[in-house]
Design a protein with these regions (language model features):
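Bacterial N-terminal signal peptides that target proteins for export
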Residues: 2-19, 29-30
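N-terminal leader/targeting segments and the immediate start of mature chains
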Residues: 31-83, 233-236, 240-243
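Gly/Pro-enriched, hydrophobic low-complexity segments
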Residues: 35, 128, 150-243
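Extracytoplasmic/secreted envelope proteins and their assembly/folding machinery
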Residues: 51-54, 58, 114, 142, ...
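Short beta-strands and strand-coil junctions in structured, solvent-facing domains, enriched
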Residues: 77-79, 97-99, 106-109, 125-127, ...
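Amphipathic hydrophobic-ligand
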Residues: 82-88, 209
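An acidic-aromatic
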Residues: 89-140, 211-212, 217
Length: 243
């Protein structure tokens, strides 16, 4: 199978996993609150259940209005059988607006304006347009950006134990969708044990591929204007509409 034929698959994986990554990052408290939360955690407290941890993550996400960050993403294994690393910036505004701008090594842009989702790859001169999922859709990551998804309702959480590369004083929660979806099989979140600050997000797909995300320079509730999430189809670009 040629690399060109694999591109649509890889971009679909990117879109699905990055969308839920946003939701999980929004669930983490800001950096300035982490030290306070860690100090307030009682020593010797009993281990928290996976369901309780997922519920706290959801509650934190529900309180966030908008969000900006830099990100890096590493994908390895799967159909491509090789390792790739990409980076860029993201903007998120609820309900249902996001802007993922990949800068290296290849420019790509994913924009959701609240109704439509646009995927633009300048090298291909192609824009893919699709509708955002409805509230009765399966547990797609984008539903969390729309304010319709619920971790404990849509996923079965569990505590997977030690995760390779996880920092000290962290805890992991694995999320398996109750309704199977094609984009991924499982998501694993590694968060600070006391503050829920996100450290790692690992998404595993059905082809054996793994995406690992790292977010830096997080800023919450900055008052992002809707204009940041408008997309104009470039002149001369091919447009592919997806149901």
């Amino acid at each position: 199978m040629s690399l060109d034929r694999l591109r649509p698959f890889r971009r679909g994986v990117v879109l699905a996993t990055t969308s839920l990554a946003v939701a999980m990052v929004l669930a983490a408290p800001p950096d300035r609150a982490r030290a306070q939360a860690r100090a307030a955690a009682p020593a010797g407290a009993p281990a928290e259940s996976a369901a309780a941890l997922a519920a706290r993550l959801q509650a934190r996400y529900d309180a966030i209005k908008d969000f900006t960050a830099d990100f890096s993403q590493t994908y390895e294994g799967g159909v491509l059988r090789r390792k790739t690393t990409e980076s860029g910036t993201l903007l998120v505004k609820k309900p249902g607006r996001m802007r993922w701008e990949y800068k290296t090594p290849e420019e790509k842009l994913f924009v959701a304006d609240g109704r439509k989702l646009y995927a633009w790859v300048p090298a291909d001169r192609q824009v893919t347009v699709s509708a955002l999922p409805s509230g009765d859709a399966p547990a797609t990551p984008i539903l969390f950006l729309l304010g319709r998804g619920q971790l404990t309702r849509d996923f079965t959480p569990s505590l997977p134990g030690a995760i390779a590369g996880a920092p000290p004083d962290s805890v992991a929660v694995a999320l398996v969708p109750k309704t199977p979806v094609p984009e991924y099989d499982r998501l694993t979140l590694v968060v600070d044990r006391a503050s829920l600050g996100l450290r790692m997000l690992i998404a595993t797909d059905g082809q054996g591929g793994t995406s690992t995300f790292v977010f830096t320079h997080l800023r919450e509730n900055v008052g992002l204007p809707d204009a940041k999430f408008a997309f104009t189809i470039p002149r001369g670009a091919d447009v592919v509409a997806q149901d």
